[in-house]
Design a protein with these regions (language model features):
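Residues that mark the start of a beta-strand
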Residues: 3-5, 25, 74, 117, ...
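RNA-binding accessory domains that recognize and position tRNA/RNA substrates
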Residues: 1-41, 53, 166-168, 180-192
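Cysteine-nucleophile active-site neighborhood
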Residues: 45, 50-128, 168-180, 185-188
Length: 192
């Protein structure tokens, strides 16, 4: 199976379950791991997990790790990981007055024009006006408030979602994002 490093910001079991279903060889590292420690493991990909807390309080070294690792291996960031991926690439994250919680938020996937329903538990969101369009493009938006729900890097095989793509709890129509990550890792592996 593919070798995947998961950076633990408050890892959900559902992410491990999705990884197991795809027969990944998982190494879980703490958020304090450096880019060198991660890359020494020679992973096929890196997942930045979801978790609690204010993304604006993260150590600068975490942002430096993201900026370095995204240039070397495919990256998939979820929840807090998505927010940190955004910050590392120049976006701002702000606390929202009314948190998003629920299992069937309508999310617009821009590239396909499809509507998917996803589970959310969000207290912070990427400020859409702060997204550096030369670095990132917005891939998903919340249909209720037009908030940024997904990002993709323009130059590197790195993407992120604010919502839970694992269907636990809630709809599983977005768990194809894990398959997209597998495809990204496989394409990257073909170049070696």
């Amino acid at each position: 199976g593919l070798s995947v490093v998961v950076i633990d910001f408050g890892l959900k079991n559902a992410i491990l379950r999705e990884s197991s279903r795809r027969k990944w060889n998982i190494t879980v590292l703490p958020y304090t791991a450096t880019a060198e420690e991660i890359l020494r493991l020679d992973p096929d990909g890196v997942v930045l997990s979801s978790g609690p807390g204010n993304p604006n309080n993260v150590r600068r070294s975490v942002l430096e790790m993201i900026r370095t690792v995204q240039t070397k291996v495919p990256m998939f960031a979820i929840g807090l990981g998505h927010e940190l991926f955004g910050i590392a690439n120049g976006a701002n994250v702000q606390q929202i007055p009314v948190e998003h919680h629920g299992v069937n938020h309508p999310i617009h996937e821009i590239i396909t024009d499809h509507i998917v329903y996803a589970t959310q538990a969000e207290g912070y969101l990427i400020d859409r006006n702060s997204v550096d369009r030369s670095q990132l493009f917005i891939t998903y938006v919340d249909m209720l408030d037009n908030s940024v729900q997904g990002l993709r890097h323009r130059r590197y095989p790195a993407f992120s979602v604010q919502f839970f793509p694992d269907g636990a709890p809630g709809p599983d129509e977005t768990d194809g994002l894990f398959d997209e990550f597998v495809d990204t890792m496989n394409r990257r592996g073909d170049r070696h």
